[in-house]
């Protein structure tokens, strides 16, 4: 077995991410396997943790160490930041003749797949290398980085937490760059939550106004094409009364078209990201290069 027990030696190819045990690990193999086939074009950044609890001093949460693999990935490889959190439980088979040196292959069970916008990651204890993970259901995990991981791996997690909170220079956290949608979860506070809509920046209002106008025009054009097609089919078979009834039933269609268009404008983070968009020229999150790992 390799030094990092969760990483089989068969996939230890040359490369800093693989050698550190943060790329092409067991969690990546699991979700890319035919059983799941999830995010097959995206790289998974992962590490092995031990779940701990605090009772005066940090100690293992269970009598036997609860090993958890925590990872992040992107639902679309072209996204500049990860948007999916993955958690898997690791169990080691125990037999009557098994010892620490003869343990068999670990059993990986995928336990959580969560959008990162519904998860709060926090560096809770730097000296003990402990992360605090809180989910949308208020479930809180305290995870200590496995001792086999070098300190550099924990620095990667520190950088990831900072990126998720503040964003990269290519995201809307940089006021010099304007996008029509948000790539980073907004950090709500009392001042912004109570601010009326009219007090938002003019650039944000104008951008949203343009999108609303475009959505309404698109909806009206679709409605117009639908009416033309309907009139052409019924021109020789229906009476004037039938045609007038068709016009009357078209009004609900306008509201049905308009509502989803407006509803999509309230989405943030990654829902509106276009994987084919070439204007951003954003670095791929799966590259795990200078944009993520840092110097």
From Swiss-Prot:
Stored InterPro entries: GARIL-like_Rab2B-bd (IPR022168)
Residues spanning the membrane: none
One example of a Gene Ontology biological process annotation: acrosome assembly
UniProt entry keywords in alphabetical sequence: Golgi apparatus, Phosphoprotein
Subcellular location: Golgi apparatus
Modified residues annotated as Phosphoserine in this record: 220-221, 251, 255
Name under which the protein is recorded: Golgi-associated RAB2 interactor protein 1A
């Amino acid at each position: 077995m390799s030094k990092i027990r969760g990483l089989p030696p068969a996939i230890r190819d040359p490369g800093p991410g693989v050698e550190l045990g943060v790329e092409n690990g067991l969690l990546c193999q699991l979700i890319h396997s035919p059983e799941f086939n999830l995010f097959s074009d995206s790289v998974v950044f992962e590490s092995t943790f031990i779940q701990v609890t605090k009772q005066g001093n940090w100690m293992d949460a269970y009598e036997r160490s609860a090993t958890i693999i925590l990872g992040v990935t992107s639902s679309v490889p072209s996204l500049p930041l990860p948007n999916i959190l993955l958690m898997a439980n690791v169990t080691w088979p125990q037999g009557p003749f098994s010892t620490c040196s003869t343990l068999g292959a670990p059993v990986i069970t995928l336990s959580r797949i969560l959008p990162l916008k519904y998860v709060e990651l926090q560096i809770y204890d730097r000296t003990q290398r402990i992360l605090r993970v809180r989910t949308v259901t208020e479930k809180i995990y305290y995870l200590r980085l496995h001792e086999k991981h070098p300190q550099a791996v924990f620095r990667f997690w520190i950088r990831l937490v900072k990126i998720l909170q503040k964003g990269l220079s290519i995201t809307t956290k940089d006021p010099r760059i304007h996008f029509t949608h948000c790539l980073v979860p907004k950090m709500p506070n009392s001042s912004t939550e109570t601010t009326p809509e009219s007090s938002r920046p003019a650039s944000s209002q104008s951008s949203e106004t343009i999108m609303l106008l475009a959505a309404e025009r698109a909806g009206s054009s679709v409605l117009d094409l639908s009416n033309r097609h309907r009139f052409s089919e019924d021109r020789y078979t229906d009476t004037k009364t039938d045609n007038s009834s068709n016009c009357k039933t078209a009004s609900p269609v306008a509201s049905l078209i308009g509502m989803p268009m407006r509803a999509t404008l309230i989405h943030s983070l990654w829902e509106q990201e276009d994987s084919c968009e070439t204007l951003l020229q954003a670095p791929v999150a799966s590259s795990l290069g200078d944009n993520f790992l840092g110097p």
